[in-house]
């Protein structure tokens, strides 16, 4: 499971970039928009590998932006929050370890599923991402939705202890 998270979320983007980058460098232009997640900065409990793979993608995005800027290539990451898709019903769940954590894993996942079902429509997220892709200049990172923008800024600016407490209250299944 852990390897699959990184294969899709990190290496999928890195390998795609590796394939297109020579053409972008040759043309001295291009835009790379990586799809991250607010989990990259929120470090969501019981979503360790997902959060870590998205954090790796954001770090990669920042490094790459500095490497290719002089070729006229811009790189950005988008941090969606919950999006209402069929992913929720297709999620493979395991009760392994739930007893060790006092049932907090299943409570946390149930809360995430509720949030996903109330999340934004995929079309809304897609429109937002398309607008970013077409901007003249891009910021390093964009969060989608006011709640997630606030959460992203809070996670990046507040002390880790505050971030961990807030994220823990939201997602730890207590």
Task: Go through the PLM ranges and name each one.
Residues 19-28:
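A short helix-coil junction within the Rossmann-fold of NAD(P)-dependent oxidoreductases
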